[in-house]
């Protein structure tokens, strides 16, 4: 983070960098600045009057808030934002501002190779076809499935009626209820298999649409390299590198580990937007996540970016 003080020692601004999609939301479902908005309020309320807290998104392409899909309690970004804000305050009070801190700004162009998604598109089309063919008719609809699922989860041993009727049938040498349970359980399994297949199909179709969209864009560009701006900023010991893609966390960690500057920060989503930019390894080991498919660049982009960053950091 970066702390800027006025000459009289008051804090003018705090720039803080954190990696996470701000998608937690608030309980009433309204518009919100999310966890970073709450964090900025905590920071501004606890420093000099008029202090401005400025959030800079980090390498959050594959980072989401904990419990952001929770269905058992209202989802609120405020607790997470408060924790983030307190963490910033804890660190910012340790920073000592220097009147003669060096200032440097660099920005250069970088040409990145575009991806050819044709092989993955073919793979997903085949998977889509297999999934559709795997769907089979059952004797249940949603209403009867929910009724049976409730019954058979409430009572594993005697789901269809009270236990005494099962024992009566057994004493009479009959197994009507047992046969009914066997048939119902078979139909429940078949229905659940269809649901699982449909969930898989929605993921396949979502990723397929993303790949096809970016394949169309890249073909329209004639496979010309994608030109982006990479910038580097130094204010005293604070060093920030920027990139227009949704960088994943491993990219940021790699840059920090290799940097000769003690406090190096990385900002994605900056000076343009080129969708997700996963590591080369993530692009080779696709797992159905959005960042695997919502991507314009080829795996070689990563090393080119590291090389450019290393050059800029040396110049700072």
Language-model-detected regions and their locations in the chain:
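Non-catalytic substrate/cofactor recognition surfaces at enzyme active-site rims
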Residues: 1-316
